[in-house]
């Protein structure tokens, strides 16, 4: 995606370099300029919604969770109303982000679901409105339940 943004896009783009490196996505994933992408089978009951580096953890988690798929947001503002059509039959939606809860993308996503009549159970996994102390990326992801194992445990209702 970095190559696409730097060399192929005709419009302005923002490139960010996340601390700890870029996410590793499934080999068969290809960015197609859509507002969002589905990774896995969207007929499953559980959806993990995310963006950025957290996509890697979610993709790892769905390998261990039989009834889940990933919805990767490529565009976070404005959110596409087409998302509601994809999720209308989903039973549980977990929104995972490395951002704060209050005013974050997950709050906007919950509003989109509500406004479009998506009646799935919704859980927002993120950083509560608090100061995040300096630490390694891996330790912070674990602390805030955003690492792959925590995501597996959340989906399997162990957390």
What positions do the PLM features span?
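Thiamine diphosphate
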Residues: 7-159
């Amino acid at each position: 995606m970095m190559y696409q943004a730097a060399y192929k896009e005709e419009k302005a783009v923002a490139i960010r370099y996340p601390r700890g490196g870029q996410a590793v996505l499934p080999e068969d994933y290809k960015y197609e300029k859509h507002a969002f992408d589905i990774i896995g089978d969207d007929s499953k009951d559980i959806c993990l919604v995310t963006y950025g580096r957290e996509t890697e953890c979610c993709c790892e988690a769905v390998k261990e969770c039989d009834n889940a798929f990933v919805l990767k947001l490529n565009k976070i503002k404005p959110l596409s109303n087409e998302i509601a059509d994809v999720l209308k039959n989903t039973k549980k939606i977990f929104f995972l982000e490395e951002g704060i809860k209050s005013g974050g993308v997950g709050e906007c996503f919950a509003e989109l679901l509500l406004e479009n009549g998506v009646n799935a159970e919704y859980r927002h996994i993120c950083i509560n409105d608090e100061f995040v102390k300096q630490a390694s990326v891996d330790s912070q992801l674990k602390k805030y339940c955003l690492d792959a194992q925590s995501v597996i445990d959340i989906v399997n209702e162990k957390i």
